[in-house]
Swiss-Prot record:
Positions of modified residues (N5-methylglutamine): 237
Organism: Francisella tularensis subsp. holarctica (strain LVS)
Function according to Swiss-Prot or TrEMBL: Peptide chain release factor 1 directs the termination of translation in response to the peptide chain termination codons UAG and UAA.
Protein name: Peptide chain release factor 1
Post-translational modification: Methylated by PrmC. Methylation increases the termination efficiency of RF1.
InterPro entries assigned: PCRF, Pep_chain_release_fac_I, Pep_chain_release_fac_I_sf, Prokaryotic/Mito_RF, RF-1
Bias-annotated ranges (Basic and acidic residues): 287-297
Main location: cytoplasm
GO molecular function: translation release factor activity, codon specific
Keyword Endoplasmic reticulum: no
HAMAP family, alphabetized: Rel_fac_1
GO CC term (a single one): cytoplasm
Entry-linked Pfam families: PCRF, RF-1
Length: 361
């Protein structure tokens, strides 16, 4: 392991001890925001400290095994060889883990997200598939203990959605869903197809981190135009009585957001403003990623909504992620929310991409 990496790890261990001490101070305990932030930092540092302690122990075991090789007892020498082999394997594994821990962390990984699903080419079938995708993400969210709420929805004529926007909140939502942005293609025989022909349709998915106050996304009130209108869709009689739905236009960028699912105009406005901040934050992230991709091509995480990232082939029971050439023949499980078999390989590919970049520097 490089000395620079060891020095970085040592500084993180010292920070872990410092944070541990701070968390027991009365002034910190009484300040909820500071206590929450420090608790998050402590949780992030804990596995690093654990892995580094195991790494240090493995180095000591290796040294002890080397010394045993000089023993005259043949049985002890064989034992030393076995221990040396195990120590080397542990060192290699832990060095790899520690390098990943030191990768630059996406500051938005802990953020909640806004999930937008829009029907693309394919007419009614695209709308139906957007509904299937929303169910898939809803089930995945449930499996991970996240919560999901619909912000706005435009239903398709034969089921599904022309567009549905939801908010997903919980632990590490963006870190797991950030690679879902892009075009999702489906190949299947629509229920309305009498000839049994396979149709190809597509939906676009956009995942945006919910903008926090600390992100510095400030919106000048003079830069927005707010319109109220009567909500439509689900909600019973209430929706026809008041102009509770909100549409906000950000004049400098032309970004438009709507919210009509909350019961009051005040709540709809708050939700719409939060979504607008997230869209502006995402625009900034997209700009940074474009600048980075000009210097190096990243296999994962470009977030380009026009990029076809995945195909769901129903006749073959196959799902293919085109960015990493991953093909799985368990489409039914994926559509029931078992997304980790796709998401985790994407995360690992992204980590490998970052490690390669670090090696080049």
């Amino acid at each position: 392991m490089k000395d620079s990496i060891k020095a970085k790890l040592q500084s993180l261990i010292e920070r872990h001890e410092e944070v541990s001490a701070l968390l027991s101070e009365a002034g910190i305990i009484s300040d909820q925001n500071k206590f929450r932030d420090l608790s998050k930092e402590y949780s992030h540092l804990e596995p690093i400290v654990k892995a580094f302690k195991e790494y240090t122990q493995a180095l000591e075991d290796k040294q002890a095994a080397y010394e045993m090789l000089n023993e005259k007892d043949a049985e002890l020498v064989e034992m030393a060889k076995e221990e040396l082999k195990l120590a080397n394997e542990a060192i290699e594994k832990l060095e790899s883990e520690l390098q990943i821990f030191l990768l630059p962390r996406d500051p938005n990984d802990d953020a909640n997200v806004f999930l937008e699903i829009r029907a693309g080419t394919g007419g009614d079938e695209a709308s139906i598939f957007s509904g299937d995708l929303f169910k898939m993400y809803s089930k995945y969210a449930e499996q991970r203990g996240w919560k999901i709420e619909v912000i706005s929805a435009s239903e398709g004529e034969h089921g599904g959605y022309k567009e549905i926007i939801s908010r997903i909140y919980g632990d590490g939502v963006y870190s797991q869903l950030k690679f879902e942005s892009g075009a999702h293609r489906v190949q299947r025989v629509p229920a309305t197809e009498s000839q049994g022909r396979i149709h190809t349709s597509a939906c676009t998915v956009a995942v945006m981190p919910e903008a926090d106050e600390v992100e510095g996304i400030d919106i000048n009130p003079a830069d927005i135009k707010v319109d109220t209108f009567r909500a439509s869709g689900a909600g019973g009689q209430h929706v026809n009585k008041t102009d509770s739905a909100i549409r906000i236009t950000h004049i400098p960028t032309g970004v438009v957001v709507e919210c009509q699912d909350q019961r009051s105009q005040h709540k709809n406005r708050a939700a719409a403003m939060s979504m607008l901040k997230s869209k502006l934050l995402q625009a900034e992230i997209d700009k940074q990623q474009k600048e980075q991709s000009d210097t190096r091509k990243s296999l994962v995480g470009s977030g380009d909504r026009s990029e076809r990232i995945r195909t769901y082939n129903y006749p073959q029971g196959r799902v293919t992620d085109h960015r990493i050439n991953l093909t799985l023949y368990k489409l039914d499980e994926v559509m029931e929310g078992s997304l980790d078999s796709i998401i985790q390989p994407l995360v690992l590919e992204h980590q490998a991409d970052l490690l390669a970049t670090m090696s080049d520097e």
